[in-house]
């Protein structure tokens, strides 16, 4: 049995960017800088081609002020 981890990072990030008084804070580059990763890593996570480490998943949750379960979802294939 295999599964799939899906995430809502792109949707959440874009929503925050639209609602923020400082939208640059929520660009891929801005988020990457705050997480200590490259912009390419953020892009890969958003596309679902890279699953972040547990440590990075917690950093994402903290950046968004959300629980990990609100960002990532496991689905059976």
Predicted regions and their residues:
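Residues within the helices of the helix-turn-helix
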Residues: 10, 29, 69
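Short polybasic/polar patches that bind polyanions
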Residues: 14, 33, 62
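Short alpha-helical DNA-recognition segment
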Residues: 19-44
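Short, charged recognition helix plus adjacent turn
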Residues: 72-77
């Amino acid at each position: 049995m295999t599964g799939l981890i899906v995430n809502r990072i792109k949707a959440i990030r874009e929503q925050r960017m639209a609602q923020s008084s400082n939208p640059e804070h929520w660009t891929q580059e801005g988020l990457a800088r705050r997480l200590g990763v490259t912009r390419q890593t953020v892009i890969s996570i958003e596309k679902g081609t890279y699953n972040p480490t547990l440590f990075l998943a917690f950093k994402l949750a903290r950046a968004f002020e959300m629980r990990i379960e609100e960002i990532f979802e496991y689905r059976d294939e």
